[in-house]
Amino acid sequence: MSDPIIIIGSGFAAYQLVKSVRRLDAHIPIQIFTADDGAEYNKPDLSHVFSKRQTAADLVVKSGEAFAEEYNVQLHAHTQVERVLTQQQQVVANGRCYPYSKLVFATGAQAFVPPMRGDGLAKVMTLNSLQEYQAAEQPLSRAQHVLVIGGGLIGVEIALDLATSGKQVTVVEPNARLLANLLPEFIALPLEQQLMKHGIQLALNSRVESVTEQGQTLAIALHDGREFAVDAVLCAAGLKANTAVAREAGLSVERGICVDHQLNTSDPHIYALGDCAQIEGRMLPYLQPIVLSANVLAKQLVGQEARLTLPPMMVKVKTPSYPIQLAGDFSPESHWQVQLSPEGIVAKAQSPLGDFTGFVVTGEYVTQAFPLLRELSQRANG
């Protein structure tokens, strides 16, 4: 019997890959190594647990054991892979060596916590996994005032959800506007106004200097001298790919594990996908590229030829009171055709040569997102 495919990780990317492989081959041996219990859950739901009053248990779609049985895989739960021996094609976990025919890193990313001072740093929570929500669930349910570090996609979604659930919320963001790396200024400003309508306090151009325990509360000091007393601190300041084991194994690693359009790393027997993978220089921490990557990699693993082609992809900012959808490429040099109304915004980006390169739609105009995406895809293909 040939050595199995080994997958390190049990998040969305890993399980999407298993499902894609099983559609092609019901019997090829697969082993999954995961540091947690391997439960299947929908990670984007973590941004909306407070308004829906969901517990960590509510988010579980399937236990790790049930997933393993349904998809005919061997699950090594609570088993951390310590090393990869590339010459021997083995992974080392709990002091044992496990051989592989092909190895897949689906190790995801961890929440980035910016450097801060103070004796309250151990109380700073993150919400990047089911296990992190399990740890944060009780403190956050008791908290009246929550400070969110980070005004990017996840930070904004969580802040609005916390406010919708009745909590006082302060967002600290080092950039001059929210979603600075994703949205043009004329879209970010109405979003900020919507958040403030929900009572959310915004501290832009700011960063947290220190978190200090003060009885039952946390004293927050910003770099500009402002201070807050809050009940909880939640950090949503971005992600850092989990690459330590890959780097130690000698694989090419930059911001993520470097892969080509076949998801192959610098080792011909090792692949990577999901939040840990850097695809031809790009980090793509969204669901659609992971699904497309899983389909391509599944074919590779069963001996078929496939190559990842990424079409223009939609990004949704799931802020119910002011929904935003966008796709394509735009930059400070882009020219914008903008349609403004009380119901929302339709904005189309053009290159200096006049080519349609991307769009942003908000409010009631999100219904125009898919026709615009179709138009963008046709131009990209054509």
Curated annotation (Swiss-Prot):
Which of UniProt's keywords are assigned here? Cytoplasm, FAD, Flavoprotein, NAD, Oxidoreductase
Q: Which cofactor does it need?
A: FAD
Name any one Pfam family assigned in the record. Answer: Rbx_binding
> Where, per UniProt, does this protein localize?
Cytoplasm
Under Gene3D superfamilies, the record lists:
3.30.390.120, FAD/NAD(P)-binding domain
- Could you cite one Gene Ontology molecular function of this protein? oxidoreductase activity, acting on iron-sulfur proteins as donors, NAD or NADP as acceptor
Predominant localisation class: cytoplasm
Family per record: Belongs to the FAD-dependent oxidoreductase family.
Catalytic function, reaction form: 2 reduced [nitric oxide reductase rubredoxin domain] + NAD(+) + H(+) = 2 oxidized [nitric oxide reductase rubredoxin domain] + NADH
Taken from the UniProt entry, a GO cellular component term is: cytoplasm
The species this protein belongs to is Vibrio vulnificus (strain CMCP6)
Superkingdom of source: Bacteria
Under the heading PANTHER family, the entry gives:
NITRITE REDUCTASE [NAD(P)H], PYRIDINE NUCLEOTIDE-DISULFIDE OXIDOREDUCTASE DOMAIN-CONTAINING
Q: What class of enzyme is it?
A: oxidoreductase
Q: In which pathway does it act?
A: Nitrogen metabolism; nitric oxide reduction
| Task of the protein | One of at least two accessory proteins for anaerobic nitric oxide (NO) reductase. Reduces the rubredoxin moiety of NO reductase.
The EC number on file is 1.18.1.-
Question: What name does the UniProt record give this protein?
Answer: Nitric oxide reductase FlRd-NAD(+) reductase
